[in-house]
């Protein structure tokens, strides 16, 4: 089983992290370890390759960074857990669809650990609350880039955020889409304590461990047939 390193990078400027992801992927060799970076960003909007700038309704003083992932516009900020997956998909024998499925399953698994019920939506990547007063609201977004069979970018899970910047955009291109965090969803740990921003490290580690478990479950027997983008 091919290991996956987990690296806690803490608070980091988005543009600098984006540059590092591109450089890491461009310099990969056959023996470069697969890794998951756990990051928190200062406030920033990011717009995907095919993103429509019209979905940025009111930028205010939050910078916009155009990036090479799929998807539309999203927001990153303090209190959000971001996991970047820098993986050699061919070596792991993973197709892109299996990677997306693993990411979404890991988020659902992590939220369930904190007593938050969530689900996928067909045709709308990400994870959404499945019950309660905020049913249908988005709590996690994902976007990926595959280059020479290797992935970067990843998934963001809203933990304890100022959610107001999401009202300045059409999140992921959907006008009026409600966006929530784990605090709003009433997340609680195993002891019944309500989670807050101080749980960032614990939640990020839980998400990373769930990602590793889901990815290992989906490893294929024939790596050469995997991702070719």
Curated annotation (Swiss-Prot):
Q: Does the keyword Ribonucleoprotein apply?
A: no
Q: Where along the sequence does the record put site: Lowers pKa of active site Cys? A: 138
Checking InterPro entries in the record gives: aa-tRNA-synth_II/BPL/LPL (IPR045864), BPL_LPL_catalytic (IPR004143), Octanoyltransferase (IPR000544), Octanoyltransferase_CS (IPR020605)
Annotated compartments? Cytoplasm
Transmembrane annotation, as ranges? none
Pathway-wise, it operates in: Protein modification; protein lipoylation via endogenous pathway; protein N(6)-(lipoyl)lysine from octanoyl-[acyl-carrier-protein]: step 1/2
PROSITE patterns on file: BPL_LPL_CATALYTIC (PS51733), LIPB (PS01313)
Question: Which UniProt keywords are listed?
Answer: Acyltransferase, Cytoplasm, Transferase
Where in this chain does the record put each BPL/LPL catalytic domain? Answer: 30-223
Protein name in the entry: Octanoyltransferase
GO-annotated cellular components: cytoplasm
Please report a single Pfam family linked to this protein.
Answer: LplA-B_cat
Keyword field contains Cell inner membrane: no
Q: Which family does it belong to?
A: Belongs to the LipB family.
Which GO biological-process labels does this protein carry?
protein modification process
Q: Anything else the record notes?
A: In the reaction, the free carboxyl group of octanoic acid is attached via an amide linkage to the epsilon-amino group of a specific lysine residue of lipoyl domains of lipoate-dependent enzymes.
Determine the domain of life of the protein's source. Bacteria
| Chief place where the protein resides | cytoplasm
Q: Give the E.C. number(s).
A: 2.3.1.181
Question: What is a single molecular function from GO for this protein?
Answer: lipoyl(octanoyl) transferase activity
Spell out the reaction equation it catalyses: octanoyl-[ACP] + L-lysyl-[protein] = N(6)-octanoyl-L-lysyl-[protein] + holo-[ACP] + H(+)
Q: Which catalytic residues are annotated?
A: 172
What CDD domains does UniProt report for this protein, alphabetically? LipB
Looking up HAMAP family in the UniProt record yields: LipB
């Amino acid at each position: 089983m091919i290991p996956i390193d987990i690296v806690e990078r803490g608070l980091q400027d988005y543009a600098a992290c984006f540059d590092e992801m591109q450089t890491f992927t461009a310099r990969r060799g056959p023996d470069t370890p697969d890794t998951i970076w756990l990051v928190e960003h200062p406030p920033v909007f990011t717009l995907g390759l095919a993103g429509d700038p019209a979905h940025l309704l009111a930028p205010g003083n939050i910078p916009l960074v155009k990036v090479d992932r799929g998807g539309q516009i999203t927001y990153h900020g303090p209190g959000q857990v971001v996991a970047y997956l820098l993986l050699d998909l061919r070596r792991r024998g993973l197709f892109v669809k299996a990677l997306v499925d693993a990411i979404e399953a890991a988020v659902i698994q992590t939220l369930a650990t904190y007593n938050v019920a969530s689900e996928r939506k067909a045709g709308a990547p990400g994870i959404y609350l499945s019950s309660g007063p905020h049913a249908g609201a988005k709590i996690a977004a994902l976007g990926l880039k595959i280059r020479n069979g290797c992935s970067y970018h990843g998934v963001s899970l809203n933990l304890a955020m100022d959610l107001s910047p999401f009202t300045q955009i059409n999140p992921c291109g959907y006008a009026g889409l409600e966006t929530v965090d784990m605090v709003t969803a009433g997340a609680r740990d195993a002891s019944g304590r309500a989670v807050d921003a101080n749980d960032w490290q614990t939640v990020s580690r839980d998400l990373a461990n769930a990602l590793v478990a889901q990815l290992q479950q989906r490893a294929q027997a024939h790596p050469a047939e995997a991702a070719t983008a």
